[in-house]
């Protein structure tokens, strides 16, 4: 049985007979067989079954057109069977349904337990391949490929030998399980095929053995022997690729982007011994010390490079000051490896830096206070000018209490305000 030719039919009314269901599914094409699942204890139908067509295209048409079909009291559910449903169908039909393989499906030699040595030992490749189940011949020798195992058998030959020992319904079950996995968990299926390339070959080889695909398709997917895969030996491009292992050689020189305050571009030169053998590579500039009027770190200081992407780390531009009294002569007073020690004039004392910061803060506070006082005085002056500009007629119109207050304020003002207002 080809699982791709079978459709699952669910939500079947209990009073509907098999002949009625078959008549419905004949609308998509000729029906090869229909199996209605019956409860063995009660003898009543369970409400679902399996319809088999002669080709996958007709089965796909039934899924598209007959899903949610109105069957009287219910609407039919039509879909491709899952791996669990195919397993139930195999148990329902039994080995006698196929009739052309002698071994039982539950044979102990085909169970998937911890004993992986249940298969017979691999024979040399010079012996003919097994043909016990009438499978088609193996692809041409030019497309067998694969690396030879210690026994002298090619890897693809060994995959075919294992598949040739399986019964036809076991291969169908394997293909249906792979199909269900690809539909339900495509990411896990992709990871499975990437980590187990032999499984990918086994799937296509099984499809070829069951005549579900042509030989030319498998031949196009295989790589002939002697052809090197692209990217097998990539040249050293000077960066760490996530696909490379850490045991590979150290990459070539990396140009560091130019930084402000006199830092020039540099290349990887050495690994700092202060971090041990697992430290990140460091970039070193020419030995000439290029100072700055601001007292910044000289250009000869080394810049640590990130081992993951080859860019300078943040700590390279903001190095932490070392503890006083613990400075290493090899690294200078700044705690950074340098080929030349900068002069004392280019390094500020911590006490002077603290004093300068405090003075700057005090000056900023004084400027803020002065600005606020000036704004307040300007506002008062504007109000007084408006008050003195009032005429006697305007003052007489005001209420008595406001009139009295304005007169008191005008009398209390100095004579200079009165002169300016006039």
Curated annotation (Swiss-Prot):
Which PROSITE patterns did the record assign? RRM
User: Which positions fall inside the RRM domain?
Assistant: 5-83
Name the keywords, alphabetized: Nucleus, RNA-binding
Stretch list, region Disordered: 337-358
GO biological process, alphabetically ordered: co-transcriptional mRNA 3'-end processing, cleavage and polyadenylation pathway; nuclear mRNA surveillance of meiosis-specific transcripts
Q: PANTHER family from the entry?
A: CLEAVAGE STIMULATION FACTOR SUBUNIT 2, RNA-BINDING PROTEIN
Organismal lineage: Eukaryota, Fungi, Dikarya, Ascomycota, Taphrinomycotina
Q: Which GO terms describe its cellular component?
A: Mei2 nuclear dot complex; mRNA cleavage and polyadenylation specificity factor complex; mRNA cleavage stimulating factor complex; nucleus
Q: Which InterPro entries would you find in this protein's record?
A: CSTF2_hinge, CSTF_C, CSTF_C_sf, Nucleotide-bd_a/b_plait_sf, RBD_domain_sf, RRM_dom
Q: Which CDD domains match?
A: RRM_CSTF2_RNA15_like
The identity of this protein, by name, is Uncharacterized RNA-binding protein C644.16
Q: Name the domain of life this protein comes from.
A: Eukaryota
GO molecular-function term, one example from the UniProt record: mRNA binding
Where in or outside the cell it occurs: the entry states: Nucleus
SMART domains in the record:
RRM
Q: What is its main location?
A: nucleus
Q: List the Gene3D superfamilies hit by this protein, alphabetically.
A: 1.25.40.630, 3.30.70.330, Transcription termination and cleavage factor, C-terminal domain (1.10.20.70)
């Amino acid at each position: 049985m080809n699982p791709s030719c079978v459709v699952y039919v669910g939500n079947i009314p209990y009073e509907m007979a098999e002949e009625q269901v078959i008549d419905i599914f004949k609308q998509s094409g000729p029906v090869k067989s229909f199996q209605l699942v019956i409860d063995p204890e009660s003898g009543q139908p369970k409400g679902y079954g399996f319809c088999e067509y002669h080709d996958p295209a007709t089965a796909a048409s039934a899924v598209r057109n007959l899903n949610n079909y109105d069957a009287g009291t219910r609407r039919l559910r039509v879909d491709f069977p899952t791996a669990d449903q195919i397993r139930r169908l195999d148990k329902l039909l039994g080995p006698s349904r196929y009739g052309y393989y002698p071994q039982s499906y539950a044979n102990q030699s085909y169970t998937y337990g911890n004993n992986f040595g249940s298969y017979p030992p691999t024979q040399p490749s010079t012996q003919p391949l097994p043909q016990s189940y009438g499978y088609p011949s193996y692809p041409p020798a030019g497309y067998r490929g694969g690396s030879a195992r210690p026994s002298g058998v090619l890897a693809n030959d060994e995959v075919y030998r294992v598949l040739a020992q399986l019964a036809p319904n076991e291969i169908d079950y394997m293909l249906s399980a792979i199909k269900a996995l690809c539909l339900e968990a495509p990411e896990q299926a992709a990871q499975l095929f990437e980590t187990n390339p032999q499984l990918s070959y086994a799937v296509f080889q099984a499809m070829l053995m069951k005549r579900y695909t042509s030989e030319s398709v498998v031949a196009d997917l295989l790589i002939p022997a002697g052809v090197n895969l692209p990217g097998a030996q990539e040249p050293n491009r000077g960066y760490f690729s996530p696909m490379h292992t850490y045991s590979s050689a150290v990459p070539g020189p990396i140009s560091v982007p130019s930084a402000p305050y006199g830092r020039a571009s540099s290349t990887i030169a050495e690994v700092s011994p202060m971090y041990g053998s697992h430290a990140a590579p460091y970039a070193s500039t020419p030995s000439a010390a290029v100072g700055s009027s601001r007292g910044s770190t000289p250009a000869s200081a080394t810049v640590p490079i990130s081992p993951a992407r080859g860019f300078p780390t943040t700590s390279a531009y903001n190095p932490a000051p070392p503890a006083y009294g613990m400075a290493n002569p090899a690294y200078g007073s700044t705690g950074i490896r340098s080929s030349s020690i900068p002069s004392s004039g280019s390094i500020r004392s911590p006490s002077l830096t603290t004093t300068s910061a405090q003075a700057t803060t005090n000056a900023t506070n004084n400027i803020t206070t002065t600005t606020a006082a000036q704004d307040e005085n300007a506002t008062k002056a504007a109000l007084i000018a408006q008050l003195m500009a009032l005429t006697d007629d305007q003052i007489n119109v005001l209420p008595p209490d406001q009139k009295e207050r304005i007169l008191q304020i005008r009398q209390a003002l100095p004579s200079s305000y009165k002169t300016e207002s006039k």
